[in-house]
Amino acid sequence: MAGELADKKDRDASPSKEERKRSRTPDRERDRDRDRKSSPSKDRKRHRSRDRRRGGSRSRSRSRSKSAERERRHKERERDKERDRNKKDRDRDKDGHRRDKDRKRSSLSPGRGKDFKSRKDRDSKKDEEDEHGDKKPKAQPLSLEELLAKKKAEEEAEAKPKFLSKAEREAEALKRRQQEVEERQRMLEEERKKRKQFQDLGRKMLEDPQERERRERRERMERETNGNEDEEGRQKIREEKDKSKELHAIKERYLGGIKKRRRTRHLNDRKFVFEWDASEDTSIDYNPLYKERHQVQLLGRGFIAGIDLKQQKREQSRFYGDLMEKRRTLEEKEQEEARFRKLRKKEAKQRWDDRHWSQKKLDEMTDRDWRIFREDYSITTKGGKIPNPIRSWKDSSLPPHILEVIDKCGYKEPTPIQRQAIPIGLQNRDIIGVAETGSGKTAAFLIPLLVWITTLPKIDRIEESDQGPYAIILAPTRELAQQIEEETIKFGKPLGIRTVAVIGGISREDQGFRLRMGCEIVIATPGRLIDVLENRYLVPSRCTYVVLDEADRMIDMGFEPDVQKILEHMPVSNQKPDTDEAEDPEKMLANFESGKHKYRQTVMFTATMPPAVERLARSYLRRPAVVYIGSAGKPHERVEQKVFLMSESEKRKKLLAILEQGFDPPIIIFVNQKKGCDVLAKSLEKMGYNACTLHGGKGQEQREFALSNLKAGAKDILVATDVAGRGIDIQDVSMVVNYDMAKNIEDYIHRIGRTGRAGKSGVAITFLTKEDSAVFYELKQAILESPVSSCPPELANHPDAQHKPGTILTKKRREETIFA
């Protein structure tokens, strides 16, 4: 049955081949017509050539026209063959596709396979005959229509769904499965390698150091062994190259070679030629005998050929030394010994003089030591004939009873301002002390005053008690005056020196009664002192010691006319001359022990030096000695400054968050207005904090009560205005909060100076708003100069913090815009 089907199929296939042959001729004609249409220029050329032949000369050779016609026909025949060959290729592709299908069917029926094979043989024979019958034509490029048709056919073939048999689908599934298995195995292998690497690393970290050292040594030896093998191969190649170079050099030297002609320099050449001949290079030696010199390995103190160069040098020097010793006379030997002794003595003296000043006695101090001493304590002086500072209380020239009082008051070591101001004050010279707050200025002017008062006869002091005090100390605020009074009583009471405070808020009659009873020192505020002077409660006829404490603060508060009025009440009979005599200690100490005839001494202490203070100093001070301690007008280096930019409504919440951090009491909070001070204190008390207030609206008793409670520890927080910003010494203040920023940088510096006193550290926190932009620039500079503070970027990058207020900014020329 299968054979009959195959025969029938052959019969059906044979007529189709005959029809295919017949259909070739119309196809050729159709292609020829298309070529004629696509190339009308060729037809025109043919018509022209015919016309030329008709109208031309008959004498033209007929053989030439026949050959041209023959060439044309040959070209057309070649073109037809090329088209037939292309069509044959297309038919062959179709037959191949059909054969693949038949092969699949033949796998199911063996009979079909045999018929198909015979048919295939017949087709291949026919194709071979066709190929042998026609010559291979010249390849022609495909036309544009054929390219487009081919591309369209490919797109359609790709768009059609491809049918896959069951076997092909199974093969595809098997292939995908195999790829998935390989990918999984690869990932497992990578994970295994990473785990092994991690375990090896952990094992190396946990293993014994000795075991790790042995393992590293073993690995290093293995690497060296492998490296030595490679090195030996490289060494052999190197030796062969060196041998060839050495042989070449010997041949050139002794057998003669082509010598390179050296370039000669002509006279007209501008450039000098620095060239050396290659044979003149003696730095490289290719002979291994000289290249690798043998180093002899010796044990102990062995030497090559028994020669010890060091020993030879020693013996040689000893020989010449003995020879010179024999030639020297006795006098020369003595001179040499004296020279050595002098040299040793000079070196010992140099070492002795180079000791630190703390290891020397007072009489051993040199000018260099005093300069180092001043640098150690940041002391800078200005003025003529300034005495040296005191190193300690024992080294000072103070009387024993004064030293005893100082020791009882707990002053172990003098502060920098005390070290320099006390010796100047003992010479009866005018002083301007510029020092930071909390530097011990009170004792600096009190101790010279107490020394002078105690030198006066006690009888004179009692008899002349109705003529007024010996000293007047002016302070800008009541609190500072009371603080100075406490210190003065502490020093003066053991010495029998009476002190009276003349300040506002206390009955004037009580103060007048105490003044009539007699006193040596009066501590006053400018306003109340003028009132007392005008009402004749006080007569400054024997006042020869005037102190202006916190002079810059007094000027800022508008007390400059009052201070000038007070100084005009002083007697002029004991005023110093404004000459060089004011700098001469001998003339200044004349009549030092008399109460009336001693020159008046004026002392001014300030934290800053504004122009108004300088003007006051020029008017009433005579040739003063100026003492600068540290960086005047700048905050403590031990105070950490923190700044927060916020709105007014956020201040209270931020303050409570800061207080919850647990800062140790006492804490001072500064506010600009009296009303705000009371409101903030009440709100803090409602939150459970112990707070008290201090401002100018409070009575004197209330102010004293608030300060005493804070110092005693009954209250933890003091809410104050700028009244508490200057001069008030409250020990161990851990934090200062500027709830409202000060109006100028000087007040800000004095505010934060309440903490970080007496060598301790502190924290100063400031709340800033947009209204405080006038002080942004100076505040930024103050924070940047502090070594323990950091400026926040909100303040550092703020436009108002880039330039000082009032400066006119001009654009650079390259930033200017020119409008034409």
Curated annotation (Swiss-Prot):
Residues 651-799 form the Helicase C-terminal domain. Residues 422-627 form the Helicase ATP-binding domain. Residues 43-65 have a biased composition (Basic residues). It catalyses: ATP + H2O = ADP + phosphate + H(+). It is found in: Nucleus; Chromosome. One of its GO terms (molecular function) is ATP hydrolysis activity. The keyword DNA damage does not apply. Residues 1-244 are annotated as: Disordered. It comes from the Eukaryota. The modification Phosphoserine is found at S14, S16, S107, S109. InterPro entries: DEAD/DEAH_box_helicase_dom, Helicase_ATP-bd, Helicase_C-like, P-loop_NTPase, RNA-helicase_DEAD-box_CS, RNA_helicase_DEAD_Q_motif. Its EC number is 3.6.4.13. A motif (Q motif) lies at residues 391-419. A motif (DEAD box) lies at residues 549-552. Pfam families: DDX23 (PF25430), DEAD (PF00270), Helicase_C (PF00271). Belongs to the DEAD box helicase family. DDX23/PRP28 subfamily. The phosphorylated form (by SRPK2) is a component of the U4/U6-U5 tri-snRNP complex composed of the U4, U6 and U5 snRNAs and at least PRPF3, PRPF4, PRPF6, PRPF8, PRPF31, SNRNP200, TXNL4A, WDR57, SNRNP40, DDX23, CD2BP2, PPIH, SNU13, EFTUD2, SART1 and USP39. Identified in the spliceosome C complex. Interacts with ERBB4. Interacts with ERCC6. This is Probable ATP-dependent RNA helicase DDX23.
